[in-house]
Amino acid sequence: MNLCLSSLLFFLVILLPSGKGMFGNDGVKVRTCTSQKAVCFFGCPPGYRWIAFCHNILSCCKNMTRFQPLQAKDPWVH
């Protein structure tokens, strides 16, 4: 693969929204991750704890019930 195509793919991967986007993201349901009562994201959003990898690039994240940071609160919900 030439350098131009590699750099384009690199920037596309960097620009992917990780965790919760502007309109919310419920994550991807993968059987190995849902058995832990968790979901898969491109990176754990604030308020989620990392557990394992899902399919090598996704992160299996579990919602934190205690000690959630202030960033975990959804600004769109009043």
UniProtKB/Swiss-Prot annotation:
Protein name (record): Defensin beta 136
Annotated signal sequence range: 1-21
Family, per entry: Belongs to the beta-defensin family.
Origin superkingdom: Eukaryota
Source species taxonomy: Eukaryota, Metazoa, Chordata, Craniata, Vertebrata
GO biological process: antibacterial innate immune response; antifungal innate immune response; defense response to Gram-negative bacterium; defense response to Gram-positive bacterium; killing of cells of another organism
Pfam families listed in its UniProt record: DEFB136
UniProt keywords, alphabetically: Antibiotic, Antimicrobial, Defensin, Disulfide bond, Fungicide, Secreted, Signal
Gene: DEFB136
Keyword Disulfide bond set for record: yes
